[in-house]
UniProtKB/Swiss-Prot annotation:
Organism listed in the record: Physcomitrium patens (Spreading-leaved earth moss)
Protein name: Large ribosomal subunit protein uL23c
GO molecular function, a single term: rRNA binding
Gene Ontology BP term (one): translation
Record flagged with keyword Ribosomal protein: yes
Summary of subunit composition and partner proteins: Part of the 50S ribosomal subunit.
GO cellular component: chloroplast; cytosolic large ribosomal subunit
Length: 91
């Protein structure tokens, strides 16, 4: 499935794991209901809330040509208590 690109692991997202919040980079055209349905079906969990934002573009230079980095959308998914995604388990 092309909706979810990959999980994001930074210092902030590792802190969010303690609050049962998981962060993914997704396709820019994906909507919250699409991602919620996909996460619930694929990981067999219940989603409590989804927050999303599109980070600003960063300039990229290759010689004399100036371009921009690829755009993506970042989703922070909060799961209901008692659920977790095994991909991120600490065990």
């Amino acid at each position: 499935m092309d909706e979810i690109k990959y999980p994001v692991l930074t210092e902030k997202t590792i802190r969010l794991l303690e609050k049962n919040q998981y962060t993914f980079d997704v396709n820019k055209k994906s909507t919250k209901p699409q991602i919620k349905k996909w996460i619930e079906n694929f990981f067999n969990v219940k989603v409590k809330a989804i927050n999303s934002h599109i980070p600003p573009e960063k300039k990229k230079r290759i010689g004399p040509i100036i371009g921009h980095s690829v755009r993506y959308k970042r989703m922070i998914i909060t799961l209901k208590t008692g659920y977790s995604i095994p991909l991120f388990s600490n065990k």
